[in-house]
């Protein structure tokens, strides 16, 4: 399977990130490594989307602080970015709404319709004509013809800061408007681009709690988008999926990360990191990166908080 026939994936993680831990970043890395090893996917970007302040979780600090901590946590990553859209809305957004927002955003930026699990896009991302080497065509004529990096998106509007995605090499693909009339002389290559929800097995288990999730949203999340699950604390994901009719129905859309790395997934726990901060426990360095710890101490977050 060539790069052009593999499914190109953007991983999206929604959560409180209160604060973001080393384990959250490890989840991205493990998911990307696993998807690459399957030979079916190329992960081209990761999105960290902190929840809105009105989510109402006890002990949730302001999104202003959580966004900064997330940005500090991913500052050395060349593929994971923090997106503030969810925090900037008037109220709390469902996970389904966040996925749909990013799908629509990717459509506008790349000029193609993103596929979902069951209905791959029939609108191609326009590629270079075969056996020809014309000058690239861009929606924005100010874009340099030979960018030095493979990243796309940058800023979409002044209010969004950096969003995240990595563009396939522009030497191979040129992104244009999906409705552009390029005539019939060009032969096109098509790539499939999908956004997958990245989560831990605890979120998967929450799908099984009656009334907690809107069933229509679950159908969209699992049925249309698909999810990548990183197991926590040796969770039995097969047992979890068997407890939900929707998870059983779309079992093929749920990819469980299986690797040989024995990560202590307890380091994902924001709760344990907050307790370590409150108790002055030196093991907080096991949970949080040093830039995040420094920011927490400087801002006096969590230190005297409970929960």
Swiss-Prot record:
Primary localization class, coarse? Golgi
Q: Which GO terms describe its cellular component?
A: axon; cytoplasmic vesicle membrane; cytosol; Golgi membrane; late endosome; synapse; trans-Golgi network
- Tell me the residue numbers annotated for binding ATP: 24, 271-274
Which residues belong to the signal peptide in this entry?
none
What are the protein's UniProt keywords? Answer: ATP-binding, Cell projection, Cytoplasm, Cytoplasmic vesicle, Golgi apparatus, Lipoprotein, Membrane, NAD, Nucleotide-binding, Nucleotidyltransferase, Palmitate, Pyridine nucleotide biosynthesis, Transferase, Ubl conjugation
Query: Pathway of this protein?
Result: Cofactor biosynthesis; NAD(+) biosynthesis; NAD(+) from nicotinamide D-ribonucleotide: step 1/1; Cofactor biosynthesis; NAD(+) biosynthesis; deamido-NAD(+) from nicotinate D-ribonucleotide: step 1/1
Which cofactor(s) are needed, names only?
A: Mg(2+)
In its record, the post-translational modification comment is: Degraded in response to injured neurite. Degradation is caused by polyubiquitination by MYCBP2 after recognition by FBXO45.
Activity regulation: the record says: Inhibited by P1-(adenosine-5')-P3-(nicotinamide-riboside-5')-triphosphate (Np3AD) and P1-(adenosine-5')-P4-(nicotinamide-riboside-5')-tetraphosphate (Np4AD).
Localized where?
Golgi apparatus membrane; Cytoplasmic vesicle membrane; Cytoplasm; Cell projection, Axon
Q: Domain of life, per the record?
A: Eukaryota
User: Which residues are noted in the entry as NAD(+)-binding?
Assistant: 16-17, 92, 95, 200, 202, 212-213, 232
Enzyme class, UniProt record, top EC level? transferase
Kindly give the membrane topology term recorded for this protein: Lipid-anchor
One Pfam entry name: CTP_transf_like
**What is catalyzed by this enzyme?**
beta-nicotinamide D-ribonucleotide + ATP + H(+) = diphosphate + NAD(+); nicotinate beta-D-ribonucleotide + ATP + H(+) = deamido-NAD(+) + diphosphate
Q: Which EC number applies?
A: 2.7.7.1, 2.7.7.18
Q: By its UniProt entry, which InterPro entries does this protein fall under?
A: Cyt_trans-like, Euk_NMN_adenylyltrnsfrase, NMNAT_euk, Rossmann-like_a/b/a_fold
- Free-text cofactor note: Divalent metal cations. Mg(2+) confers the highest activity.
Q: How does it assemble?
A: Monomer.
* Role according to the record: Nicotinamide/nicotinate-nucleotide adenylyltransferase that acts as an axon maintenance factor. Axon survival factor required for the maintenance of healthy axons: acts by delaying Wallerian axon degeneration, an evolutionarily conserved process that drives the loss of damaged axons. Catalyzes the formation of NAD(+) from nicotinamide mononucleotide (NMN) and ATP. Can also use the deamidated form; nicotinic acid mononucleotide (NaMN) as substrate but with a lower efficiency. Cannot use triazofurin monophosphate (TrMP) as substrate. Also catalyzes the reverse reaction, i.e.
**Which protein family is it in?**
Belongs to the eukaryotic NMN adenylyltransferase family.
The name this protein carries in UniProt is Nicotinamide/nicotinic acid mononucleotide adenylyltransferase 2
Give the organism, scientific name.
Answer: Pongo abelii (Sumatran orangutan)
């Amino acid at each position: 399977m060539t790069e052009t026939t593999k499914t190109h994936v953007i991983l999206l993680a929604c959560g409180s990130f209160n604060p973001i831990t080393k384990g959250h970043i490890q989840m991205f890395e493990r998911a990307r490594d696993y998807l690459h090893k399957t030979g079916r996917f190329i992960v081209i970007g990761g999105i960290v989307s902190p929840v809105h302040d009105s989510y109402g979780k006890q002990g949730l600090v302001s999104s202003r602080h959580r966004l900064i901590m997330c940005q500090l946590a991913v500052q050395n990553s060349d593929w994971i970015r923090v997106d503030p859209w969810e925090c900037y809305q008037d109220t709390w957004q469902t996970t389904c709404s966040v996925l749909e927002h990013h799908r629509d955003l990717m459509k506008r930026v790349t000029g193609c319709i993103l596929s979902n699990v069951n209905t791959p896009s029939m609108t191609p991302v326009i590629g270079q004509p075969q056996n020809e080497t014309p000058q690239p065509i861009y929606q924005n004529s100010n874009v340099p013809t030979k960018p030095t990096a493979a990243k796309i998106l940058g800023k979409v509007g002044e209010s969004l800061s950096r969003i995240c995605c990595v563009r396939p090499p522009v030497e191979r693909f040129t992104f244009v408007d999906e409705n552009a009339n390029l005539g019939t002389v060009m032969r096109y290559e098509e790539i499939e681009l999908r956004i997958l929800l990245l989560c831990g097995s605890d979120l998967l288990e929450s799908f099984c709690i009656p009334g907690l999730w809107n069933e229509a949203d679950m159908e969209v999340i699992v049925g249309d988008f698909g999810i990548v699950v990183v197991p926590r604390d040796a969770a039995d994901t097969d047992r979890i999926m068997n407890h939900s009719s929707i998870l059983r129905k779309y079992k093929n859309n749920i990819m469980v990360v299986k690797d040989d790395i024995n990560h202590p997934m307890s380091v994902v726990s924001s709760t344990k990191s907050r307790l370590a901060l409150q108790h002055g426990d030196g093991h907080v360095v096991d949970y949080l990166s040093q830039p995040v710890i420094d920011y927490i101490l400087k801002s006096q977050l969590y230190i005297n908080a409970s929960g």
